[in-house]
Design a protein with these regions (language model features):
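Polybasic low-complexity intrinsically disordered regions
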Residues: 1-91, 138-142
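Basic, amphipathic alpha-helical segments enriched in Lys/Arg and hydrophobic/aromatic residues
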Residues: 75-82, 96, 101-147
Length: 147
């Protein structure tokens, strides 16, 4: 258990440039943010996927994600919900799994959603010291995208 004032407790991770924060999110087909998660900069993407998908994953949907989310447990969660996974296989996967390249082109919606958040200086530069304040700022901006 980390202390709340420790760098890890404040979603700060070490990198070459100093302390960094990584914002994980999922969005719908229109680029509206549905779920957010905040971690330190060195944290992996894949462990955040189950929490991001849990709340709004429905049968018949296609889940688009990049190679960082190519894990069997993520694909299993998507399949159990009755949705389809459109995730390219990592280079080191022994048996590559096919994905629909045409549907995968729509993955830029998540990149647009991230850029929409980072248009706001407070999110792009993380002026907030506390992770809870930064997360609240990101949530507020995410709500604005729905209006």
């Amino acid at each position: 258990m980390q202390k709340k004032d420790s760098p890890v407790g404040q979603a700060l991770g070490r990198s070459r440039g100093g302390f960094t924060t990584k914002l994980h999110l999922s969005c719908d087909a229109y680029g509206r943010i549905c779920a957010l998660a905040l971690t330190g900069g060195q944290a992996g993407d894949c462990p955040q996927a189950p929490g991001l998908l849990r709340s709004h994953l429905r049968a018949g949907q296609a889940v688009l994600a990049d190679r960082a989310y190519d894990a069997d447990y993520v694909r299993l969660q998507i399949r159990q919900a009755g949705a389809g996974a459109v995730i390219p296989s990592k280079k080191n996967r022994t048996v590559p799994i096919e994905h629909d390249a045409e549907i995968y082109k729509e993955r830029n919606q998540i990149e647009r959603a991230i850029n929409g958040l980072k248009r706001f200086r407070a999110v792009a530069n993380r002026f907030d010291k506390r992770a809870a304040n930064y997360f609240a700022t990101c949530c507020l901006i995410a709500v604005l995208t729905w209006l």
